[in-house]
Amino acid sequence: MTFSYKRFLNLPKPTKEDFRGDRERILDALNMPDASMTLEALRSLYPLTARADYAVTVTLCPGDRGTDIIRVEPGDTTHRLLGLALDIGSTTLEMELVDMLTGQVLQNVGCVNSQV
């Protein structure tokens, strides 16, 4: 199961003839016209895309109601995708920072559940 993935995009720059917004450029480049974008990702677009010379990486998260764009970063960051795994047990809490591309656990921490 894929929880999220990244795609690097070289977006076309705006011109007098092509005045689409950055969101529309991203959706067109992904060929995902119905994808939604989180408010945080949407707010990050300006001036990020122009400063990155329209070369950006988007993080996508597939769900029951389609694909969400949850983050936009300048440049190509497809080599780095981290996730957090949580295990909330009846007696202990465990967390692991995971490299989602390799499955390698980078860090882990645990503690006794204080509600016990």
Q: Where is each model-derived feature located?
A:
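Extended, hydrophobic alpha-helical segments in both membrane/secreted and soluble proteins
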Residues: T91-M95
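Short glycine-rich, Thr/Ser-proximal phosphate-binding strand/loop in the N-terminal lobe
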Residues: L97-V116
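Nucleotide/phosphate-binding catalytic cleft detector across ATP-hydrolyzing
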Residues: M1-A85, S90, T102
